């Protein structure tokens, strides 16, 4: 595969992460769980200024699908990835663009006139991370942006699309445009469940997109939320992964759907549509002393898997690459990888 054609195009919510450590008091104050992701309610909107006033904040480029796309680019030739999302006309957007430029991800942003770039409070406690998001401009993404010349060029070249589950809270119409494009051209549509509240409260939107998807990522809590939303009685992760794999399929590629469920340091589970046996991939052991924080580890894993699949690797080989990038990410502050690049293929 030659680089330069934007083989992978991701769609999601571009956010600037505002990360703090030792945030136990913040969890209690704002009613957050240690290892969760939520959209900020009215009471929680005060958290962003609170962090700035009372903590040493580290600012890092975030947004789950944007993180995954940057991590996919890490293993791909130059100019292989592009990202679609909506930002404000502000300094936060410039910071996101600069991070993407540095790591070789092409930003095809829509700009909102009246909303600031979205932000995400990342509260680190021990090896856990709690995410509290104010979408801002991100939820102003308009389907018309997909028709712009720059977006069309990337979309028509894409061999793989990646949808962040978070995007489905407001952008299912845009997601379905890419899903239909994937179906028409028989290319890959991949997606991430992203957080328990997505399959739990946006079940209808998830169920609209899943039939087009041939690779679906999630973690153990997201899989459990999907099972509950679909009245699946089993709590067994292999059974749940298989149920997601066997869900409706409307494209040729989705007929061979692969579902990948991570569970932190525990083995990664893989289910393939129509099969009776699931596969278990051991996660490389990491010394707890080497863990800086886990923010973005799941995105790094997904990005590694996607990048490897775009390169034509098998699912097993791709998961190995994903584990390497996830392991690398938790040794850094925030959702970033080591530079100069290390060969993980």
What is the predicted function of each stretch?
Residues 103, 108-112, 120-168:
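Conserved phosphate-binding/catalytic loop of the ribokinase/pfkB sugar-kinase fold
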Residues 85-89, 106-117, 241-246, 259-263:
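Beta-strand->loop->alpha-helix junctions that form or flank phosphate-binding loops
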Residues 1-21, 34-35, 180-184, 228-345:
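Conserved phosphate-binding/catalytic region of the ribokinase-like
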Residues 11-13, 85-89, 112, 124-126, ...:
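Cofactor-binding loop segments of dinucleotide-utilizing enzymes, especially the Rossmann-like FAD-
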Residues 151-156, 209-210, 253:
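A short, aliphatic-rich alpha-helical micro-motif
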């Amino acid at each position: 595969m030659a680089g330069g054609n934007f083989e992978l195009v991701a769609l999601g919510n571009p956010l600037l992460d505002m990360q703090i450590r030792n945030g136990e008091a913040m969890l209690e104050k704002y009613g957050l769980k240690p290892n969760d992701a939520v959209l900020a309610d009215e009471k929680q909107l005060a958290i962003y200024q609170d962090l700035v006033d009372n903590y040493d904040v580290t600012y890092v480029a975030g947004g789950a699908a944007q993180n995954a796309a940057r991590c996919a680019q890490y293993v791909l030739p130059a100019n292989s990835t592009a990202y679609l999302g909506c930002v404000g006309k502000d300094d936060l957007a410039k910071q996101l663009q600069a991070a993407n430029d540095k790591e070789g991800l092409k930003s095809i942003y829509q700009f909102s006139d009246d909303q600031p770039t979205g932000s995400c409070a990342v509260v680190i406690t021990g090896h856990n991370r709690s995410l509290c998001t104010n979408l801002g401009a991100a939820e102003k993404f308009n389907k018309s942006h997909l028709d712009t010349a720059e977006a069309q060029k990337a979309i028509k070249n894409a061999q793989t699309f990646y949808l962040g589950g978070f995007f489905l809270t407001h952008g299912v119409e845009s997601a379905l445009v890419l899903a239909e494009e994937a179906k028409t051209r028989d290319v890959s549509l991949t997606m991430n469940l992203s957080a328990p509240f997505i399959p739990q409260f946006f079940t209808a939107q998830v169920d609209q997109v899943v039939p087009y998807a041939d690779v679906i990522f999630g973690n153990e809590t997201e899989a459990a939320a999907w099972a509950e939303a679909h009245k699946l009685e089993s709590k067994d992760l292999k059974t749940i992964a298989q149920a997601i794999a066997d869900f409706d399929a409307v494209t040729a590629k989705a007929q061979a759907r692969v579902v990948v469920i991570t569970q932190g340091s525990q083995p990664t589970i893989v289910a393939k549509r129509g099969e009776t046996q699931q596969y278990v991939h051991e996660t490389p052991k990491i010394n707890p002393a080497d863990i800086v924080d886990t923010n973005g580890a799941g995105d790094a894993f997904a990005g590694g898997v996607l990048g490897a699949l775009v390169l034509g690797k098998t699912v097993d080989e791709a998961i190995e690459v994903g584990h390497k990038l996830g392991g690398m990410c938790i040794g850094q502050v925030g959702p970033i990888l080591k530079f100069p690049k290390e060969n993980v293929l």
